[in-house]
Amino acid sequence: MAGHSQFKNIMHRKGRQDAMKSKLFGKLAREITVAAKLGTPDPAMNPRLRAAVVAARAENMPKDNIERAIKKALGGEGENYAEIRYEGYGPGGVAVIVEALTDNRNRAASDIRSYFTKSGGNLGETGSVSFMFDRVGIIEFDRSVASDDAVLDAAIEAGADDVISGEGGHEVYASPDSFHEVAKNLEAKFGEPRKAALTWKPQNTVSVDDETGEKLLKLMDLLNEHDDVQNVYANFEISDALMAKMGG
């Protein structure tokens, strides 16, 4: 788990630095529409849609926006979006995974490639860095839902693989195959989680100096600000001082 908290800080920084809340809501709505289109429009029967709705609620997305995004799928929207995973190396040889939902593959690929190039990195082929990450499900709860032992016991009973509890809350990890069942069981016990999603967790992290770290954070910002980009993952650690300096 080396560097995990730093990794989380980078992900949280993304949320705080979105220039406009509407941009974030747009991305959340896109995921909701696509999830509803690929499955049933009922979150209770569609695990991916359920996770998307949980993510939207965690960002205080209005209920009307969520319902409107689901209705778009019923109206035929959402089928034009392609799910694409981009992989490459950023400054310092740091591995980066970018998940996108786009209705224009050429535009998305061109933009993302240019971001990597401008930062001193390079976009690779699919599979070029994902072997350095594990695909896992993560379910997060607020610290107040239960004691560390209670969450651990419930997670083990639900079939989870790992639990990390700290001041920031409880994080429960599960394999992709068991993720939705684990999330369902834990939600029945503790209520709706603040996050439930499949993620790419770095197997190991690399420490970078402040100069490289600054370039990497700028690359993360560029990627996260792109309308088509849904998630960005990387395997680096930076100093707390630099994180604070960059607004983390």
Swiss-Prot record:
SUPFAM superfamilies: YebC-like. NCBIfam families: PRK00110.1, PRK12378.1, YebC/PmpR family DNA-binding transcriptional regulator. GO terms for cellular component: cytosol. GO terms for molecular function: DNA binding. Gene3D superfamilies: 1.10.10.200, 3.30.70.980. This is Probable transcriptional regulatory protein BBta_6910. Disulfide bonds: none annotated. Its main location: cytoplasm. Keywords: Cytoplasm, DNA-binding, Transcription, Transcription regulation. InterPro entries: Integrase-like_N, TACO1_YebC-like_2nd/3rd_dom, TACO1_YebC_N, Transcrip_reg_TACO1-like, Transcrip_reg_TACO1-like_dom3, YebC-like. Belongs to the TACO1 family. One of its GO terms (biological process) is regulation of DNA-templated transcription. It holds the Pfam family Transcrip_reg. It is found in: Cytoplasm.
